[in-house]
């Protein structure tokens, strides 16, 4: 893979995004930062926003920008290989993921979805989003892309900031249309993946099992976005049942469901 910015160890994720955005758009880094910040550092959303506001539309890039990127033939061939009826749809994505060496249940798939700017996995991916993303990462072949995702997978295991970003991103990605909450069973499936010992946020296994048991015993059928996000902070601060019992502050701004969990643990002592 040539000039893969993901592998840089001396730059923060934000700085990497600014450099990639600036390289593609040729705009001032301050402008890059502005668009990235207001799009929560998702480079594909920021690019769409930039081209809409500064130039016209993202899809008009080729006709409007003086020097549009020329994508390598190998890269366009990868895209063409996976499309169905000119769409990179969910079936295309599943096949692509499998040929990268993963499956939909792997957390690395979330890294891929985040990189490509997916809001929902069921929505077709635009040609420009696919090509521009891999072009910015210096990837033209499946082999290049495999190395890129391996690098992100390692980052997910080692970088707490990136892990938190992917964890928070996952909620909206798995949320069904026209709903505000996810089913508890689905939440549990993903928590079992995110809170494996090899990832940055570690807690005693008994604590995670106690949380699952509490949800089931109390008939909690759905999980809100606030609960999803705050649970990660909760486990960072209180990695053991004993620490919760001894240090938990009921006056702090935790969701009510976490207060209930604390009371449940107290009753079991």
Swiss-Prot record:
**Where is each DCUN1 domain found?**
70-266
Q: Where is the signal peptide?
A: none
Which is a GO BP term held by this UniProt record?
protein neddylation
Tell me the GO molecular function terms. Answer: cullin family protein binding; protein-macromolecule adaptor activity; ubiquitin conjugating enzyme binding; ubiquitin-like protein binding
Q: Recite the UniProt keywords alphabetically.
A: Phosphoprotein, Ubl conjugation pathway
Q: Which residues carry this modification: Phosphoserine?
A: 12
Q: Which InterPro entries match?
A: DCN-prot, DCN1-like_PONY, PONY_dom, UBA-like_sf, UBA_8
Spans traversing the lipid bilayer? none
Gene Ontology CC annotations of this record: ubiquitin ligase complex
Where would I find the UBA-like domain in this sequence? 14-51
The subunit structure is: Interacts with the cullin CDC53. Interacts with ubiquitin via its UBA-like domain. Interacts with RUB1/NEDD8.
Q: What does this protein do?
A: Required for neddylation of cullin components of SCF-type E3 ubiquitin ligase complexes. Neddylation of cullins play an essential role in the regulation of SCF-type complexes activity. Does not act by preventing deneddylation, but rather facilitates neddylation, possibly by acting with HRT1/RBX1 to recruit the Nedd8-charged E2 UBC12 to the cullin component of SCF-type complexes.
Protein name, per record: Defective in cullin neddylation protein 1
The record's gene field reads DCN1
């Amino acid at each position: 893979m040539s000039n893969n910015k993901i592998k840089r160890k001396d730059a923060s994720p934000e700085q990497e995004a600014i450099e990639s955005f600036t390289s593609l758009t040729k705009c001032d880094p301050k402008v890059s930062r502005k668009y990235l910040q207001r799009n929560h550092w998702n480079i594909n959303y920021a690019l769409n926003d930039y081209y809409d506001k500064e130039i016209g539309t993202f899809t008009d890039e080729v006709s409007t920008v003086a020097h549009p990127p020329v994508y390598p033939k190998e890269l366009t061939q990868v895209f063409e290989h996976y499309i169905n009826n000119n769409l990179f749809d969910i079936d295309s994505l599943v096949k692509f993921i499998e040929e990268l060496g993963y499956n939909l249940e792997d957390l690395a798939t979330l890294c891929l979805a985040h990189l490509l700017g997916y809001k929902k996995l069921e929505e077709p991916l635009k040609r420009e989003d696919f090509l521009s993303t891999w072009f910015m990462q210096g990837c033209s072949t499946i082999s290049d892309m495999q190395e890129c995702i391996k690098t992100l997978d390692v980052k997910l295991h080692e970088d707490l900031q990136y892990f938190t970003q992917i964890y928070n991103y996952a909620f909206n990605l798995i949320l069904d249309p026209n709903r505000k909450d996810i089913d508890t069973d689905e939440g549990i499936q993903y928590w079992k993946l995110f809170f494996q010992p090899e990832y940055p946020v570690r807690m005693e296994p008994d604590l995670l099992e106690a949380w699952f048991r509490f949800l089931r015993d109390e008939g909690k059928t759905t999980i809100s976005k606030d609960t999803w996000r705050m649970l990660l902070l909760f486990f960072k601060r209180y990695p053991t049942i004993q620490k919760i019992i001894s240090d938990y502050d009921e006056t702090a701004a935790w969701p009510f469901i976490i207060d209930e969990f604390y009371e449940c643990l107290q009753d079991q002592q």
